[in-house]
Amino acid sequence: GPPLLPPLP
């Protein structure tokens, strides 16, 4: 499935 969290900076 799609990632649950946005990428970390």
UniProtKB/Swiss-Prot annotation:
<protein>
    <recommendedName>
        <fullName>Skin secreted peptide P2-1</fullName>
    </recommendedName>
</protein>
<keyword id="KW-0964">Secreted</keyword>
<dbReference type="GO" id="GO:0005576">
    <property type="term" value="C:extracellular region"/>
</dbReference>
